Each structure stands twice: as C-alpha cells, then as structure tokens.
Amino acid sequence: MTKALYDRDGAAIGNLQKLRFFPLAISGGRGARLIEENGRELIDLSGAWGAASLGYGHPAIVAAVSAAAANPAGATILSASNAPAVTLAERLLASFPGEGTHKIWFGHSGSDANEAAYRAIVKATGRSGVIAFAGAYHGCTVGSMAFSGHSVQADAAKADGLILLPYPDPYRPYRNDPTGDAILTLLTEKLAAVPAGSIGAAFIEPIQSDGGLIVPPDGFLRKFADICRAHGILVVCDEVKVGLARSGRLHCFEHEGFVPDILVLGKGLGGGLPLSAVIAPAEILDCASAFAMQTLHGNPISAAAGLAVLETIDRDDLPAMAERKGRLLRDGLSELAKRHPLIGDIRGRGLACGMELVCDRQSREPARAETAKLIYRAYQLGLVVYYVGMNGNVLEFTPPLTITETDIHKALDLLDRAFSELSAVSNEEIAQFAGW
C-alpha cells in the first residue's frame, strides 16, 4: 500500500519551512476548493495565505503559463530583457498613482521584496534607521526580519535604529485611544529623540495581516505618512497580502486617502506562482547596479502569470467583486457571533477579513487553544482556514477573489458547525501542530 502523502511529506521535507495547523495533504484544486489525495474536497478560505488570488486552475493563468512555458523568453531579467517582465512592469507602473518617475524591482516573495526595498533605501539615502510596527510580519529573510515586529520573530536580529510602534488596533487600543493619535504622539516623541536624518524608511501595512487582520482607524495612515514625510522619511506600504483587489480597491492604501512613496506587492500577484514587486521612485531603484538580485528574478513564466492576474482583475472588476463578497462573508460571521460567545470581534475590508476569538467578551482574554481546536475541527468538516495574530486567536479569511457566493454560504455553515463541535477535538490532536 502506498504511504500517505502527509507521511511522505514528514519523512522527506524539513520542518524549517512548515507552518502547519492540521494534516492537510493536497493533490489538486479547482476554483476555491482544494482536493486531498482521497478525493475529498475542502473549501479554501485562506487562498494559500492569499497567494491563490484567482483560485486554483483559473483558465487565464493556465493559458498564460502554458504559452510562456512553451516558448520561454529566457529565465531571468538579470542579464537580458524579456517581454513578459517588461510588460508586467509597465502594467504595474500604470496602476500606481504616485507622482514622479517610478520603476519596478521584481522578486520571488514578499520577504525578498521588503528586504530589497529597505536595502535600496539605505543605499540611496544613507539612512539606516527604520520605523515599523509591533505585529508586523514583513518576511522571513534576515533583512526583512530585521524590521518585522511579530512575536514569532522576537529572537531575530533587528536593524540598528529600529523604532517599533504599536499598531493601531480599535479592538485593543493603545492607551485606550481608538483613534490611534496616541501612537502618533509616541512616534513624534521617538523621532525627537534620535539624530535628525537618521531614519530612512517607515514600513506599514494598510491592514496588518499576520498581526491579527487589524484595520486601522480612518485617517491614521495619512497622518502617519505626514509625520514621516516631514522628517524626510520614505513611507513603504506593504500590501503583499492585502493588495491587488483584495480589499475592495485595486490598492489597499486607496481606502486611506494617501499614496505611499513605495509599494510592495507579492502573494496574489503571481496567482500561485512565486512573484513579488516593488514600485519605487527611480532614484531609489537605480541607486546601484547588481545590488539586489537573484538568478530567477523577473522569470518570464511567473511574469506571464502576473499579467494574467492583472488583466483578470481589470476585466472582471475583482475589486468590486471582493467588496461585495467580503460584505457577505462578514455579515455571515456577524450572524455566527450571535450564537457563539467565543467570537469577540469581526473586522476587515473586502475579502481580507478577521475574526478574533476571546474567552470572555468583557475581559477580551485571547482564546488561543480554542482557536487551534476550531480550525482543526473546521478542517475535519471540509474547510481550510488558518489563524494569525500575536496571541494566535484571530481567524484570517483571505479566500480566492473568485470564490462563489455558494461556497461562502457553505463555508459559513461548516464554520458554524465547527463552533458547535469544538469539544470533539482533543488537546493531543492539536499538540503536534505548532501553528504560529
């Protein structure tokens, strides 16, 4: 008898790159559904952490990748230009409303894109200091971990001159100030305490994803950017997970009425293939040659997939679709909250939604163990959803933008049942899955 796929995975692939919550073993997928090796279908409310922006087996991506693979324009942009990468760069530049001349840097992931943005800023400006937020997960390379503030990376070496601020969380407000102004006051105080001209970059997520799917108070990002720019600090918007139509707008920063100096994209840009991008002023990305490169950067097959994603977003008006379906999902989650007291807060924009679980709605004590059991039971019932947050108690919903309303309703029914059957999962069953 053939050994089960998950067992083979355990024997052959190292744990360094695993973030597992239950024994999911995938043999295929279609639309917003994953297929296990026994043929069981599961509704995917994670979308591979947002990477499967168009779902699985989308015809536009299949056609684009097949054509690019059949007649590949090389394999990289390092030492030769290739049409898919150049065309994708032009398309991305046309989508960005920033003033002045901008260029593109291509990478494989949000991790290398955020690191490249930071390194380029330091090289171009001579300023190595950086502002970021507690709870922020900007990547898993040495460079991107240096200015990440997530608790899982607490032991990583941090950048010299790092200023780490609380992220504005209306559900758990810093100094009991839901407006976030107390954080801006803290920022002003910290900037006054460091040498002028020492801070080069400020990284912020317009929705903090891995920190708990937190939507900041209206106007916070604009006020934050104004303070930074008054000190000559470039504002970098990390939209790796929440950008490109997911929030209900093409770019998530559009909700906030400001335009960042630099935009970082990834995950959904490749529609499931490794692809990321930095959009930045030309003087930043032209500051040096051969300074931030890897051999397969600008790969034409990945770039072709990226073009297919952007064309589908435009043709099918996926921002409007994400807004409508996200509202449907959050309305359904709100109905669940009426029946399940574990649910403390529901938040999000478009198809980037979060549901925070608490032991008690008054004390808001994080329900970490219950969260792990809930998603495990949901998996057993046929639903894929993961948790995020500094306390591991926020369910994150980032399904394919193409998910059907039928699948949303079905997923809500399964989640409702999982809440009711939480006791069916033992501590022993979840103990082997570290999660976050």
From Swiss-Prot:
Protein's name according to its UniProt entry: 2-aminohexano-6-lactam racemase
Alphabetized GO MF terms: 2-aminohexano-6-lactam racemase activity; pyridoxal phosphate binding; transaminase activity
EC number: 5.1.1.15
Family listed: Belongs to the class-III pyridoxal-phosphate-dependent aminotransferase family.
Quaternary structure and interacting proteins, as annotated: Monomer.
Protein function: catalyzes the interconversion of L-alpha-amino-epsilon-caprolactam and D-alpha-amino-epsilon-caprolactam.
CDD domains documented for this protein: OAT_like (cd00610)
Active site: 137
Signal peptide as annotated in the record: none
Pfam families: Aminotran_3
Residues involved in pyridoxal 5'-phosphate binding: 110-111, 137, 238-241, 295
